[in-house]
Amino acid sequence: MSTPGKENFRLKSYKNKSLNPDEMRRRREEEGLQLRKQKREEQLFKRRNVATAEEETEEEVMSDGGFHEAQINNMEMAPGGVITSDMTEMIFSNSPEQQLSATQKFRKLLSKEPNPPIDEVINTPGVVARFVEFLKRKENCTLQFESAWVLTNIASGNSLQTRIVIQAGAVPIFIELLSSEFEDVQEQAVWALGNIAGDSTMCRDYVLDCNILPPLLQLFSKQNRLTMTRNAVWALSNLCRGKSPPPEFAKVSPCLNVLSWLLFVSDTDVLADACWALSYLSDGPNDKIQAVIDAGVCRRLVELLMHNDYKVVSPALRAVGNIVTGDDIQTQVILNCSALQSLLHLLSSPKESIKKEACWTISNITAGNRAQIQTVIDANMFPALISILQTAEFRTRKEAAWAITNATSGGSAEQIKYLVELGCIKPLCDLLTVMDAKIVQVALNGLENILRLGEQEAKRNGSGINPYCALIEEAYGLDKIEFLQSHENQEIYQKAFDLIEHYFGTEDEDSSIAPQVDLSQQQYIFQQCEAPMEGSQL
């Protein structure tokens, strides 16, 4: 019986007679995706607008009821908090000057590092609604801008704080402000909407339902300052982000044309967020992948794999990797852009996450047809993959194992022989000792494919001797396979039993020699093996 759920997900995606060929191309496990997102520092989902000291010095001093900067900073604080009764009175006054002055004070409070008093602001009765009301003051663009800044910083907080801004009705007004004649107001509205969309899939969908995309895309048609373009493409990437559930594709796909030319902007931040957006849009079924391909972005994405900033390389690689999870024709589009040489270069990256993603991408190429496997061979990638399989961090070795096993699954006899000649058997045998059941199965399947070829050769040449049995024994693979007959995973022990019975005969097993478990190294220890066996580093 197979184990239900995502534990089986990658193993089903394995081109083998006993497994489902329709699912051979692996999509990233949800759990792994979430971990990557949590660790990713290159892209922030929320940003707080904090004025620099220089900007604060250059601010105009308010007159007619306003306060000098020093007065604002030194204002007597309310007992137990930072919001004074004067600030509250001024915000609700009928004087535009006092309204602006008070709004600036709130903005300064919320721009303080590192812990702005967001809760105190939103818990002051009527204040958030008042700032939303100020957004409508078309006759006073400065008040609009300052109010938008306040609300942006509130929305940069946690989900509850963001929800307060939404419930006050700010989102439709912010979307209207994207068409403001004042660029400062436009940019602050973009920033606020990006923070709200970046909070959760629910907030993202609400912003999309409010029809943000047309006015947001319209911003890109203007000659904007760089900060505006940066904020707009970052907001756009937040609208495309999320998997549970993903955004409705029809609502975000109109941005593909804009993203295609943003890939040619020289600014690193713009490039990075455009690539992240494309990686989100391509992370899904083949029809989404096709839409991304049809936008004409593939060649440029491949070029960006060689960018000198990892902030760009990471999302470009993610997008390329997602595209090759498609069918063979879609994968070929990437191959036709000369991607393999760039991927080979990334296999030697000092950044482990890049190396791992490159292996994952290659594993989906080797899940293709034999011609595509041959292009990987011709690009001389397998020596690097086998080296990674022997020496890299475990999370990277796992992806390299998929790349090699996929090639043994769909490859020709000559292609499999080539992998054996490169020395793939020993590192595959070494993986049989790790505690990760899925990777043990991947290694077993790779070895089974090799043994099956050896059996065919033995029959063809009449020798009756499978040449690969000896190689597996020399790599202590037989000892490990024998032990796997007592594995707790039913599929593993059944596979191990079948391999022993079919390819190695039925030798008596000394059950008294049971290997110990080294939990610190996440592997089994075989006393009869003189050579050390590498364990995984989870």
Curated annotation (Swiss-Prot):
Database matches in InterPro entries: ARM-like, ARM-type_fold, Arm_3, Armadillo, Importin-a_IBB, Importin-a_IBB_sf, Importin_alpha
Arranged from A to Z, the UniProt key words for this protein are: Acetylation, Cytoplasm, Nucleus, Phosphoprotein, Protein transport, Repeat, Transport, Ubl conjugation
Q: In the record, which positions carry Phosphothreonine?
A: T3
A molecular function (GO) held by this record is: nuclear import signal receptor activity
Q: Where is the IBB domain?
A: 1-57
Biased composition range(s): Basic and acidic residues? 20-41
Region (Disordered) location: 1-41
Q: Name one GO cellular component term.
A: nucleoplasm
Q: Write down which residues bear the modification named Phosphoserine.
A: S63
Task: Show me the ARM repeat boundaries.
Answer: 77-117, 118-161, 162-206, 207-245, 246-290, 291-330, 331-372, 373-412, 413-457, 460-504
The biological processes this protein is annotated with in GO are: NLS-bearing protein import into nucleus; postsynapse to nucleus signaling pathway; regulation of apoptotic process; regulation of canonical Wnt signaling pathway; satellite cell activation involved in skeletal muscle regeneration; skeletal muscle satellite cell proliferation; skeletal muscle tissue regeneration
**UniProt xrefs under SMART domains:** ARM
Q: Give residues where N-acetylmethionine occurs.
A: M1
The listed location of motif Nuclear localization signal is: 42-51
Q: In which domain of life is the source organism classified?
A: Eukaryota
Q: How is it modified after translation?
A: Polyubiquitinated in the presence of RAG1 (in vitro).
The annotated region (NLS binding site (major)) lies at 149-241
| Compartments (UniProt record) | Cytoplasm; Nucleus
What turns on this gene? Injection of 6-hydroxydopamine into the ascending medial forebrain bundle causes the formation of lesions and leads to up-regulation of KPNA1 in the denervated striatum in a time-dependent manner, reaching a maximum two weeks post-lesion.
Notes on the domains = Consists of an N-terminal hydrophilic region, a hydrophobic central region composed of 10 repeats, and a short hydrophilic C-terminus. The N-terminal hydrophilic region contains the importin beta binding domain (IBB domain), which is sufficient for binding importin beta and essential for nuclear protein import.
**How does the annotation summarize its subunit structure?**
Heterodimer; with KPNB1. Interacts with APEX1 (via its N-terminus). Interacts with CTNNBL1 (via its N-terminal). Interacts with AICDA (via its NLS). Interacts with ANP32E and ZIC3. Interacts with SNAI1 (via zinc fingers). Interacts with NSMF; the interaction occurs in a calcium-independent manner after synaptic NMDA receptor stimulation and is required for nuclear import of NSMF but is competed by CABP1. Interacts with DCAF8. Interacts with ITSN1 isoform 2. Interacts with TALDO1.
Function according to Swiss-Prot or TrEMBL: Functions in nuclear protein import as an adapter protein for nuclear receptor KPNB1. Binds specifically and directly to substrates containing either a simple or bipartite NLS motif. Docking of the importin/substrate complex to the nuclear pore complex (NPC) is mediated by KPNB1 through binding to nucleoporin FxFG repeats and the complex is subsequently translocated through the pore by an energy requiring, Ran-dependent mechanism.
Protein's recorded name? Importin subunit alpha-5
